């Protein structure tokens, strides 16, 4: 297996300014990871000064449907713009390389594409999604940006890149009755800029989950070898077992780095 010199990312939320912020600094100083992917919860710009104290590279993740952001519906347009402007502020102040967006739920992919294009955000990346939303949690039915055609439409219209979420892709493949690893290969043709990674317990499920690396059934070594490009940014999006420590994340990173060297 070829060593890909992957750059690993820690996923945090803007409200995580208590224990996780200090833990992030400690682990970064130890060389455990390379950047923070920061999900900006709406109306939390008061936390920006705390994140600015860290001398760590950032990627920004715009808020999604659970926080009222839905690019797929025209009636959300005004609030979508307000939420985006807060993410833009974080990205500007933290010198973030990218801002990641979800395509929304239900609605229409053309609306998603046009609203994202209206931001004129050169750092924008669209993240591929599962085909179906999590039941009893997301309040909708179908995710935009789950298929090759919708992703191409959004990327072409908004002139944006793609954030390739491996787990989301497997979920979408199952909903579309496509062999999961074959669908991963198909998505690779869209030339993704960066990646999200967690393990997968049920490789036949249409629903998203985030188990720790090495605890599920995803062939992570295959993903590294066949999907990730040289020097890729890979945000590890596994569940956090503690509200104070990030040692579980550290173990995930060790597993990922070991997979590169086999």
Regions picked out by a protein language model, each given a short descriptive name:
Residues 11-15, 39-41, 63-65, 104-106, ...:
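Active-site beta-loop-alpha junctions enriched in small/polar residues
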Residues 35, 59, 125-127, 163-166, ...:
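Generic enzyme active-site microenvironment
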Residues 1-86:
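N-terminal pre-domain/capping segments
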Residues 12-16, 77, 138-142, 173-174, ...:
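Short, flexible loop segments at the rims of nucleotide/cofactor-binding pockets, characterized by
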Residues 40-57, 89, 110-118, 148-155, ...:
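Short amphipathic alpha-helices and their capping/turn segments at secondary-structure boundaries
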Residues 30-34, 129-137, 167:
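Short, basic, glycine/proline-bearing loop/turn elements
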Residues 70-161, 248:
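Active-site acidic/histidine proton-transfer and metal-coordination neighborhood
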Residues 1-7, 22-29, 81-97, 157-161, ...:
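Histidine-acidic metal/acid-base catalytic patches
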